[in-house]
């Protein structure tokens, strides 16, 4: 197969004091996200999408929250590891698109830094990486400011070198 599509989703609830980390960007906020790792909901969704595209399971199977070595783990490092698997299977990024669902904090001021971090970690061009954010108009858990969710979609292309 020359093309593979993956979809990922993750959610973390708010808990302790902030800041939060989204796409490797630290964002000041009154609460942090509860998680075994750094709680980067967007990069977790992206890792799931990449793993799913290659039928390699999910982030929990590769980085279990029962394993102490992943306590407080930097999700950018997890993403880079997942990308080594993508490359070892002979694929590269075609494009990726993330949708962050959060009533607060506002993501817009941080979107370009998020895109740049991802671009670096997946070895892609900036025009292959899209990150956007939306609210739920105060509906549901995100609207009540109980947590943040993220959806990720990726298209992988067979590498020319493969």
Curated annotation (Swiss-Prot):
GO-annotated molecular function: 2-C-methyl-D-erythritol 2,4-cyclodiphosphate synthase activity; metal ion binding
Cofactor note: Binds 1 divalent metal cation per subunit.
Pathway: Isoprenoid biosynthesis; isopentenyl diphosphate biosynthesis via DXP pathway; isopentenyl diphosphate from 1-deoxy-D-xylulose 5-phosphate: step 4/6
Residues holding 4-CDP-2-C-methyl-D-erythritol 2-phosphate: 10-12, 36-37, 58-60, 63-67, 102-108, 134-137, 141, 144
Cofactor needs: a divalent metal cation
EC number: 4.6.1.12
Keywords: Isoprene biosynthesis, Lyase, Metal-binding
Binding site for a divalent metal cation: 10, 12, 44
GO biological process: isopentenyl diphosphate biosynthetic process, methylerythritol 4-phosphate pathway; terpenoid biosynthetic process
Site (described: Transition state stabilizer): 36, 135
Keyword Metal-binding annotated: yes
Catalytic reaction list: 4-CDP-2-C-methyl-D-erythritol 2-phosphate = 2-C-methyl-D-erythritol 2,4-cyclic diphosphate + CMP
Pfam annotation, one family: YgbB
Assembly behavior: Homotrimer.
Family: Belongs to the IspF family.
Record function comment: Involved in the biosynthesis of isopentenyl diphosphate (IPP) and dimethylallyl diphosphate (DMAPP), two major building blocks of isoprenoid compounds. Catalyzes the conversion of 4-diphosphocytidyl-2-C-methyl-D-erythritol 2-phosphate (CDP-ME2P) to 2-C-methyl-D-erythritol 2,4-cyclodiphosphate (ME-CPP) with a corresponding release of cytidine 5-monophosphate (CMP).
HAMAP family xref list: IspF
Name of protein: 2-C-methyl-D-erythritol 2,4-cyclodiphosphate synthase
């Amino acid at each position: 197969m020359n093309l593979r599509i993956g979809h990922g989703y993750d959610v973390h609830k708010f808990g302790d004091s902030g800041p939060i980390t989204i796409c490797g960007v630290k964002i000041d906020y009154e609460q942090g996200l509860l998680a075994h790792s750094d709680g980067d909901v967007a990069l977790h969704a992206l890792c799931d999408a990449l793993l799913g595209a290659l039928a390699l399971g999910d982030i929990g199977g590769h980085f279990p929250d029962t394993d102490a070595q992943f306590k407080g783990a930097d999700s950018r490092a997890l993403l880079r590891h997942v990308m080594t698997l993508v490359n070892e299977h002979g694929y590269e990024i075609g494009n990726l698109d993330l949708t962050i669902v959060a009533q607060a904090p506002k993501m817009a001021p941080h979107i370009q830094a998020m895109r740049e971090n991802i671009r670096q970690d997946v070895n892609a061009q900036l025009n292959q990486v899209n990150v956007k954010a939306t609210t739920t108009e105060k509906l549901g858990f995100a609207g009540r400011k109980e947590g943040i969710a993220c959806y990720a979609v990726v298209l992988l292309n067979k590498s020319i070198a493969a």
